[in-house]
Amino acid sequence: LFERPQGGERAVLVRLILEGSEDPQEFAEFQELASAAGAECVALISGRRSAPDPRLFAGSGKAAEIREAAQAGAAALVIFDHALSPSQERNLEAFLQCRVIDRTGLILDIFAQRARSFEGKLQVELAQLRHLSTRLVRGWTHLERQRGGIGLRGPGETQLETDRRLLADRIRQIRLRLDRVEKQREQGRRARRKADLPTVSVVG
């Protein structure tokens, strides 16, 4: 469902030092997270800002530097070690002409790769969907590619409305599945408690 970093996917890593947030070890941790997600770092971009730029987070000058690094390294992905707003993510993707994910998306991706149980995978997908729901405006074409596209749209719906409906449907389905898993677990606990009760025989 998600366009996550593939093994060896070339990426530019961006971490800005904002006022009061300087910690050299955090950049090393960020690189380790990106590597764990399967990204191949082709460039590290850093800089200082007193506060994030409302439009491009890094500012137009730094964003231009990021774009040049992505083009030079043939990177189709830029990962920010910050939480980006939906509008910042959209603006950056339009400016950089490549996919952008923030720290939250990166961590959710790692969780998704490492989830083993059925319930764990559902919980991670639900978190990813909620994260994605605020970013629908950029055009969710990969969902149509995976599910066929034709026949999905309702009468008079715009693509954005279709995407939102499909997203809401999927979230609802996952919640129902998680509810069933929880009920099955509770039934199992009750059965085990019942099995542990001592059996008393009365001889008369």
Residue ranges and their predicted role:
Residues 78, 129, 167:
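Conserved hydrophobic/aromatic pocket- or pore-lining residues that grip, position, or stack substrates
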Residues 105-126:
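Short alpha-helix plus adjacent loop in nuclease-associated cores
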Residues 14-18, 51-55, 108-115, 149-165:
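Short hinge/gating elements
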Residues 82-83, 123, 154:
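Conserved residues at beta->alpha junctions
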Residues 2-11, 139-204:
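Conserved G1/Walker A P-loop phosphate-binding module
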Residues 1-109:
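N-terminal accessory targeting/assembly segments
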Residues 126, 130-144:
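A charged, well-structured terminal subsegment
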